[in-house]
Amino acid sequence: MAEIRNYTMNFGPQHPAAHGVLRLVMELDGEVIRRADPHIGLLHRATEKLAENKTYVQSVPYMDRLDYVSMMVNEHAYVMAIEKLLQIEVPIRAQYIRVMFDEITRILNHLLWLGAHALDVGAMTVFLYAFREREDLMDCYEAVSGARLHAAYYRPGGVYRDLPDNMPQYQPSAIHDEKATRARNENRQGSLLDFIEDFTRRFPGYIDDYEALLTDNRIWKQRLVDIGVVSPDRAKALGFTGPMLRGSGVEWDLRKKQPYEVYDQVDFDIPVGANGDCYDRYLVRIEEMRQSNHIIKQCVEWLRKNPGPVITDNHKVAPPSRLAMKQNMEEMIHHFKLFTEGMHVPRGEAYAAVEHPKGEFGIYIVSDGANKPYRLKIRAPGFAHLAALDEMTKGHMIADLVAIIGTQDIVFGEIDR
């Protein structure tokens, strides 16, 4: 008699729905998944080890490259941990700028997640719409830091520089003539705050467009409802955070429960799911984009009325201005020491966590009093989510695996570190 056995199949690391370099070794009974074993490490770059050989400020750009879709939020956790060790106050204007860019980054992340998730499931249009909006937010990154992706904008003690008074302008090219260029530059005539305010006015309408395409779409609901269900207790036991935890009905958000920066001074709600399935996690992230938009509006309003310093005046931590450095010998020494040797952080240890678009992103630093960390540990939210993939997919069809990976919002930069 013929023996009936499950067969083993590789999913990824080249599969377009694998979100980077995910490799799954799956045990299948026909089309039903019996086991899904994630193999990680293909994007390991030894970030934690590299940070031990760099000064504290030199490691800021490494943070951008962890979750390379949520750049500034990674930096935020890192500089907050350093500030805890240094026990320095961050100027209130810098705190508002950080919160504003954290929420811009959250929208950037969720737009990419939405576009990629819909594309994996088979809806192409949303992907194109999402990238149209991402372009405007990338321009905000570029205006403050000069880079569209790896900004390296946050610094221990504040941010690199204040918000610019004018936006970069498009130039005529072979593709766009003078008239088309004028139309493209229409909302770029004012400052960065004007540009962001214009975006916040338009964005709720765009979210309505995404929802019109997906939320009540029969095929979308058939692919997501009752797929990858996780109960509230199980979500907590598995170490879920962020939208994955809130999608299961647990109202936990670090911005509300353990407020940092000025999150206790802005108004927003925590969206929570009811059933803990892929569809609930989709709805939670959609509503998070609306809440982020609301927070950005409040930050823009406050920043308009309150000019001020954007980085600490402690020159043992932050460099003096270029003008002061060229006029004063003491400032020049500070500048030279900071950029050659770096700052010496007091002996001790600190953990700082932020509400990252994917969950709780934490940085744990151990300092031995030198100008480099003795040890840096990164707590990546996606790591716990990926570890639960086997449990979430068991008993589902192979087509549902793609929907579950999409709903986890996995980026391998932070998982492999």
From Swiss-Prot:
Catalytic activities: a quinone + NADH + 5 H(+)(in) = a quinol + NAD(+) + 4 H(+)(out)
Main subcellular localisation: membrane
UniProt keyword Repressor present: no
InterPro entries according to UniProt: NADH_Q_OxRdtase_suD, NADH_UbQ_OxRdtase_49kDa_CS, NDH1_su_D/H, NiFe-Hase_large
GO molecular function: NAD binding; NADH:ubiquinone reductase (non-electrogenic) activity; quinone binding
Enzyme class: translocase
Gene3D superfamilies: Cytochrome-c3 Hydrogenase, chain B (1.10.645.10)
Listed SUPFAM superfamilies: HydB/Nqo4-like
Compartment(s): Cell inner membrane
Domain of life: Bacteria
UniProt entry tagged with the keyword Membrane: yes
HAMAP family for this protein: NDH1_NuoD (MF_01358)
Described function: NDH-1 shuttles electrons from NADH, via FMN and iron-sulfur (Fe-S) centers, to quinones in the respiratory chain. The immediate electron acceptor for the enzyme in this species is believed to be ubiquinone. Couples the redox reaction to proton translocation (for every two electrons transferred, four hydrogen ions are translocated across the cytoplasmic membrane), and thus conserves the redox energy in a proton gradient.
UniProt-listed PANTHER family: NADH DEHYDROGENASE [UBIQUINONE] IRON-SULFUR PROTEIN 2, MITOCHONDRIAL, NADH-UBIQUINONE OXIDOREDUCTASE 49 KDA SUBUNIT
Protein name: NADH-quinone oxidoreductase subunit D
Gene source species: Nitrosomonas europaea (strain ATCC 19718 / CIP 103999 / KCTC 2705 / NBRC 14298)
Name of the gene encoding the protein in the UniProt record: nuoD
